[in-house]
């Protein structure tokens, strides 16, 4: 469920 947010968070890291 938080996979999409995790990807965006990681990409913005």
UniProtKB/Swiss-Prot annotation:
<keyword id="KW-0288">FMN</keyword>
<keyword id="KW-0285">Flavoprotein</keyword>
<protein>
    <recommendedName>
        <fullName>Flavoprotein WrbA 1</fullName>
    </recommendedName>
</protein>
<comment type="similarity">
    <text>Belongs to the WrbA family.</text>
</comment>
């Amino acid at each position: 469920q938080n996979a999409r947010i995790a990807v965006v968070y990681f990409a913005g890291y």
